[in-house]
């Protein structure tokens, strides 16, 4: 769709989105009526349960109210869980878990037993177990197990914890692979609908299935479009769930005109800042990227959020970078009060139109997937992966041509920065296994290289060669003309890690040549 240069009041004419109210179906303006509160989540990869517990208790005192534990399946047992969750007040903090997909039911049983042993009020327990059959196909090419069988067993096992969600729609994987906003949303809706369709056909009530689904979206740097994306997501998902006519499974005041459960139509949304646009060089610029992304998600009304530490591209985040990531969200809450105002974008000529445009394009994609047999069939055929990989290719081309700007990488790079020991970090399985790309593949996978990867490879290769070619700017003539050309040339060559020697200007060409020879330049650029 096309975005106009500006919008006016008449652009709102005919838009039904302006009639929506906060906390009311179809939840365009959010699922909450009183505030815009969201949970600050931090991830913990559990190598030692005792150390992970100590870290969790520490960060809970520093503003975190949602924890995400990545646990190793081979170490799972009651004692392990007891150590991991020791002294954590589960009624006061959201607990989220991911492990090997073949052990999620075991994890659910252990969690239920632990909470029952501690005699917690189950109505106060909030959290999730990350079961995502389809994400494993997307990222690792593995079609393992039976989604319906595992899904049914998992929902049954977690039944004593009514507010725990166990079916994950990890659209973050699409975002990190370079998917455009409408692609991410359209495929996420088809992903969620696949759970709804298959599990309701297996005999599970629609309301129960819907209340067990959690969406995990990525956040790109398209500030206003991301705000609109979250608004459109809730609108579309509410209508998808409503089409299943979910019946209330408990007493509820939030019923539709035909008695359907409208609570089931609420989309549970976790958002995480994207890694696609993060960079290895000039890495502190990542803080600017993730800050604007966090603002988009907060204004878009997400339920919880993870801000990716700025150094994740080249090392395991340390205490410093994790503290900065936490504080980025806390600043939005405590200093900017983003958690106090519900959907401040409502009525905006621009954002209301963006919401409708994104919703329409995502809905068209959703329908095309459904017409082709659904999300599962599309994954097996490879059409989802092919479309997203094509977007990845197009965005890499845009970055190469500087139509998509990565500050510090393809535009205004730091001339003197060296990578040193920095090396791109390769992804690992969430259950603590090996590298993702080493696994044998049953289906085509997503290409999840970052937008900056090709520029970084060029700079790293230059640095590894042991000699940085010197590029000498021989500037002469009109001041404005020569500066413009010198600046362009400096940026262009510095993107490859070349040593750039800029100059104020020479009176004659001979003087410039003499200076270039004295500098032992490998390249001379006449500006």
Model segments located where?
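Conserved, mostly hydrophobic/aromatic
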Residues: 63, 119, 237, 300, ...
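Intrinsically disordered or highly flexible coil/loop and linker segments, enriched in small
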Residues: 65, 90, 121, 160-164, ...
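Intrinsic disorder at enzyme termini
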Residues: 1-29, 303, 361-471, 477
């Amino acid at each position: 769709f096309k975005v106009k240069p500006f919008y006016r009041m008449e652009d709102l004419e005919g838009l039904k989105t302006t009639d929506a109210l906060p906390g009311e179906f179809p939840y365009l303006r959010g699922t909450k009526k009183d505030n815009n509160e969201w949970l600050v989540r931090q991830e913990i990869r559990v190598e030692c349960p005792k150390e992970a517990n100590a870290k969790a208790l520490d960060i809970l005192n520093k503003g975190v109210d949602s924890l995400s534990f990545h646990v190793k399946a081979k170490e799972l047992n009651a004692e392990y869980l007891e150590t991991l969750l020791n002294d954590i007040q589960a009624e006061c903090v959201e607990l989220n878990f991911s492990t090997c997909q073949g052990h999620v039911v075991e994890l659910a049983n252990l969690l239920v037993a632990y909470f029952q042993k501690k005699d917690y009020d189950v109505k106060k327990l909030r959290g999730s177990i990350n079961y995502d059959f389809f994400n494993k196909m997307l990222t690792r090419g593995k079609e393992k197990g039976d989604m319906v069988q595992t899904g049914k067993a998992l929902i049954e096992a977690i039944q004593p914890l009514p507010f725990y969600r166990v079916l994950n729609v990890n659209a973050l994987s699409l975002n990190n692979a370079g998917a455009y906003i409408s692609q991410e949303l359209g495929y996420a809706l088809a992903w969620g609908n696949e759970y709804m369709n298959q599990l309701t056909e297996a005999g599970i009530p629609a309301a129960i299935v819907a209340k067990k689904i959690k969406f995990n979206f990525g956040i790109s740097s398209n500030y206003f479009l991301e705000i609109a994306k979250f608004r459109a997501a809730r609108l579309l998902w509410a209508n998808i769930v409503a089409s299943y006519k979910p019946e209330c499974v408990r007493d509820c005041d939030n019923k539709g005109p035909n008695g359907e459960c409208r609570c089931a139509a609420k989309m549970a949304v976790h958002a995480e800042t994207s890694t696609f646009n993060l960079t290895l060089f000039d890495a502190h610029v990542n803080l600017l990227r993730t800050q604007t992304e966090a603002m988009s998600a907060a204004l878009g009304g997400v339920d919880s959020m993870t801000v990716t530490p700025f150094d994740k591209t080249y090392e395991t985040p340390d205490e410093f970078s994790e503290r900065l990531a936490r504080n980025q969200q806390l600043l939005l809450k405590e200093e900017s009060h983003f958690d106090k105002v519900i959907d401040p974008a409502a009525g905006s000529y621009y954002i209301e139109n963006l919401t409708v445009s994104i919703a329409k394009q995502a809905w068209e994609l959703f329908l095309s997937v459904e017409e082709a047999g659904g999300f599962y069939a599309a994954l097996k055929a490879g059409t989802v992966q092919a479309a997203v990989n094509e977007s990845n290719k197009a965005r890499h081309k845009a970055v190469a041509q500087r139509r998509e700007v990565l500050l510090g990488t393809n535009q205004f790079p730091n001339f003197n920065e060296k990578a040193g020991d920095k090396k791109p970090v390769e992804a690992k399985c969430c259950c603590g296994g090996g590298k993702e790309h080493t696994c044998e593949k049953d289906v085509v996978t997503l290409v999840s290289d970052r937008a900056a990867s090709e520029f970084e490879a060029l700079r790293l290769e230059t640095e590894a060669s042991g000699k940085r070619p010197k590029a000498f700017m021989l500037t002469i003539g009109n001041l404005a003309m020569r500066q413009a050309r010198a600046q362009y040339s400096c940026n262009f060559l510095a993107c490859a890690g070349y040593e750039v020697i800029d100059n104020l200007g020479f009176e004659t060409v001979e003087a410039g040549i003499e200076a270039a020879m004295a500098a032992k330049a490998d390249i001379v650029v006449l500006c």
